[in-house]
Amino acid sequence: MDVRPERSGWRDLALSQRHRKWGWDCPAVDLDFLFLEYDKGEPVAIIEYKHERASPQYASHPTYQAMIRLGTRANIPVFAARYKDDFSDFAIVPLNALAQEKLPDRKNMTEREWVTFLYNIRGYTPPDQLFDGAKIKI
């Protein structure tokens, strides 16, 4: 079975092509937009961001299963976040039990709600001035 070719063309193509030569049983993933949210050097969440026009993603896919297991083993909540082009909406999905403690079910949030959530998982409240003016549209 052949390994899928590099699709985007903007990653380090040489390494991507080389790794694919290592075979089907040596899978790896270039995590396109994976964020490690942290506070004072301590990880607080892993978030996989996808643009609204990106292909659908499934938590059952081996790539997601590896990411979920990584978070669970590290005792870090893992979320998927699909965002609109204008950042007016973030569809958040908790992917492991630790994430479900913070957010029991999938939820659509405004940018303000999402930013507030990110502050809250760090134990903080966002400063009021953060939402003033042009910094963050509401």
What residues fall within each predicted segment?
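Nucleic-acid nuclease catalytic cores
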Residues: 71-97
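Helix-rich interaction surfaces within compact, conserved domain-sized segments
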Residues: 66, 97-138
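Basic, amphipathic alpha-helical patches used to engage nucleic acids or provide basic targeting signals
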Residues: 60-76
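Intrinsic disorder/low-complexity detector
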Residues: 14, 32-34, 53, 98, ...
